A protein has these predicted regions:
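Active-site recognition of the HExxH zinc-binding catalytic motif
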Residues: 103, 119-127, 131, 193
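Catalytic Zn2+-binding segment of zinc metalloproteases
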Residues: 115, 125-142, 160
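Acidic/histidine metal-binding catalytic segments
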Residues: 79, 137-146, 166-170, 205-215
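Membrane-active amphipathic alpha-helices enriched in small hydrophobic residues
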Residues: 145-161, 169-180
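Hydrophobic or amphipathic, alpha-helical segments that drive membrane association/targeting
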Residues: 1-2, 6-94, 179, 223, ...
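Short pre-active-site segment immediately N-terminal to the catalytic Zn-binding motif
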Residues: 102-119, 183-188
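Extracytoplasmic and endomembrane cell-envelope/extracellular-matrix remodeling and assembly machinery
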Residues: 23-30, 41, 53, 61, ...
Length: 489
C-alpha cells in the first residue's frame, strides 16, 4: 500500500532520525528539502507501479517543455522539477513534494489553448517553490514527521480513476482524495500560487490571462446539483469569482499577447485524442468525420496517427510525408515518417529519415526512443544500445527509457548489462527487492567481468541501505540456498 511504501521511503526513520536545522525557515524546521525530495520520489515510485503514467515520449517531452519554460522564471536553481501525465479523464493537476507535477489527460483535453495549460502548470510550480506543503504542515504542528510523510503519500487526488483494475492504484486514489482535502492548502496559499504563477507565465512568454481563462472554464463546470461529482480540480483548487477577478487584474500588469499555440500543443492533444478511443477504428472514424482537405495540419496529424495505430501504414505515411514537407522543424513529423517507412519495410529509407532527424535534433528524447525501437525491430541491437546509452548518460532517463535499453542490451547479447538495467527499472518504480534480485542474477553469470562484479555489488550495498526490515526479510526469503552473505543479508 501507499502507507507501507512511505514507511520504507522514510528509511525506517522516526522524527528523531531527521536532523532539524538550528536556523532557517519554519518550513525547513518541519520538512527539509531533502525530506521533500525523498517523499516525492517514494510517491512517484508508487504512481509508476500503478501503471497510470502515460508512456508516450512525445507527450511527456511536451509537458516538460512547457513546464521547464515556466520553472526557468520562478525557480532559484535549488529545486528540480519533473512533469508527467496521468491517464485519467478527470480534470485535475497536482504538485508533490520534491517538484513532481502531475497533469491528468482530462485536464489537458479541457484546456482550450497552450496558455491555459501553462497557467495550470505555473500554479502547481508555485506551490512547490513556495514550499506550501511544508508550510501547511508547520501550521498544524500536531503530527510527527513520520505521520506527515505517510499523510503526504496520499496527496494524489484522483491519480488513477476509481474503476482501475489495479487494486493498489485504487488505494492511491482513495488516500489521495482524503489527503489533499486534509492538507487543504489555505486560501492565501492558493492566491500566492496564482500570483507567483502569473508572473512566471508573463516572464516565460505565455499570455498570463490564460490562468484566469482556465479558472473561468472550470467555474462553469460546477454542477448546480450538489449530488453531481465536481471535477477534481475544483475540489482541490476551489475557484471563486473573486479569485478569477484577482487573476485577471494581475494579468493586466503584463502586455496582452495574442494566443498562439505551439505545434507541439496540438500534437500532444491529437495523440491523446487517438488514445482516448477504446478501438483503433473508433479513432479513425473520428478523424475521418471531416473532409481531409478541410482539416488543418494538427487534425491531419491525428488522422495519420490513427491510421498508424490501425495498421494502415501507407495511408499514415502519405500524410506524415506531406506534413514533414511543409514543416521540417516538427520532430513528431520526422518520427511519423521514419516509423511508417520501417513498418512498410522501407528499411533504408526509414533509417535515413531517423539519421537525418537525429543530426538536426541531437539527443531529443522521443526521437531517440522511437529510433531505438525501430533499430531493435530491424535487429540492429548494438546500434540501438549505443544511441540509447548516449541518451541515458546525457539526459535524466524515465523508467520506460531504462526498460528499453535493457531490451537493447539483451538483444545485443549483453546479458549482464541487460539485468543491470532491469534492476534500475525496478528501482525507479519502487521495487527494491526486485532491483536487487536482478543484480544477483547478474552476479551469478559465469561470463561476468570483474569491473561489473564490483559495480553490481556496490549497487546492492547502496540499495540495502534504503530497505526496511520487512524488505530485507523478503529478500532473504527469496534467496536460493547457499547464497552469499552479501546477497542474502
Amino acid at each position: 500500500s501507499m502507507m507501507a511504501t512511505l514507511l520504507v521511503a522514510t528509511s525506517g526513520a522516526g522524527a528523531d532520525d531527521i536532523k532539524l536545522p538550528d536556523m532557517g525557515s519554519p518550513a525547513d524546521a518541519v520538512l527539509s528539502k531533502s525530506d521533500e525530495a525523498r517523499i516525492g520520489r517514494a510517491i512517484m515510485a508508487q504512481i509508476q507501479q500503478s501503471g497510470s503514467v502515460v508512456e508516450d515520449p512525445i507527450v511527456t517531452e511536451y509537458i516538460n517543455e512547457v513546464g521547464s519554460r515556466i520553472v526557468a522564471h520562478v525557480n532559484d536553481g535549488t529545486q528540480s522539477f519533473e512533469f508527467f501525465v496521468i491517464d485519467d479523464p478527470n480534470i485535475n493537476a497536482f504538485a508533490l513534494p520534491g517538484g513532481f507535477i502531475g497533469v491528468h489527460t482530462g485536464l489537458l483535453e479541457a484546456t482550450r489553448n497552450e496558455d491555459e495549460l501553462a497557467g495550470v502548470l505555473a500554479h502547481e510550480v508555485a506551490h512547490v517553490t513556495q514550499r506550501h506543503i511544508a508550510r501547511a504542515i508547520h501550521a498544524s504542528q500536531r503530527q510527527s514527521i513520520m505521520n506527515t510523510a505517510i499523510m503526504l503519500g496520499a496527496i494524489l487526488a484522483g491519480v488513477v480513476s476509481g474503476d482501475s483494475d489495479v487494486a493498489q492504484a485504487g488505494m492511491v486514489v482513495a488516500q489521495g482524495t482524503a489527503a489533499q482535502q486534509q492538507i487543504n492548502f489555505t486560501r492565501s496559499n492558493e492566491y500566492e500560487a496564482d500570483r507567483i504563477g502569473i508572473g512566471a507565465m508573463g516572464d516565460a512568454g505565455f499570455d498570463p490571462h490564460g490562468m484566469a481563462s482556465f479558472f473561468e472554464v472550470m467555474s462553469r463546470q460546477s454542477p448546480a446539483d450538489l449530488d453531481m461529482r465536481l471535477p477534481e480540480f475544483l475540489r482541490t483548487h476551489p475557484v471563486t469569482t473573486q479569485r478569477i477577478a484577482e487573476a485577471r487584474n494581475r494579468a493586466r500588469a503584463y502586455p496582452r499577447r495574442p494566443s498562439k499555440d505551439s505545434v507541439n500543443y496540438g500534437i500532444a492533444g491529437a495523440r491523446m485524442k487517438v488514445d482516448s478511443y477504446d478501438t483503433e477504428e473508433g479513432a479513425v472514424e473520428y478523424f475521418e468525420s471531416r473532409d481531409y482537405e478541410q482539416q488543418n495540419d494538427i487534425e491531419k496529424y491525428g488522422r495519420a496517427v490513427a491510421y498508424q495505430r490501425a495498421g494502415r501504414y501507407r495511408d499514415a505515411n502519405r500524410i506524415f510525408e506531406e506534413l514533414l514537407e511543409r514543416n521540417q522543424k516538427v520532430i513528431a513529423y520526422h518520427i511519423g515518417v521514419g516509423e511508417t517507412q520501417l513498418a512498410l519495410e522501407q528499411n533504408d529509407l526509414g533509417v535515413a529519415t531517423f539519421e537525418r532527424a537525429v543530426s538536426l535534433f541531437p539527443r531529443n528524447v522521443p526521437l531517440v526512443i522511437h529510433y531505438g525501437e525501430g533499430l531493435l525491430k530491424l535487429g540492429e541491437a548494438d546500434k540501438a544500445h549505443r544511441i540509447l546509452l548516449d541518451l541515458m548518460n546525457n539526459v535524466p532517463p524515465t523508467p520506460e527509457q531504462v526498460r528499453l535499453i535493457a531490451r537493447a542490451a539483451n538483444q545485443a547479447g549483453d546479458t549482464a548489462e541487460a539485468l543491470y538495467y532491469l534492476s534500475e527499472y525496478h528501482l525507479m518504480t519502487g521495487n527494491l527487492v526486485g532491483g536487487i534480485s536482478f543484480l544477483q542474477r547478474a552476479l551469478a553469470l559465469p561470463e561476468l567481468q570483474e569491473i561489473q562484479r564490483i559495480r553490481f555489488e556496490a549497487r546492492i550495498d547502496f540499495i540495502r541501505e534504503y530497505m526496511s526490515e520487512e524488505q530485507l526479510k523478503q529478500l532473504q526469503r527469496s534467496q536460493p540456498v547457499g547464497a552469499s552473505a552479501r546477497n542474502s543479508g
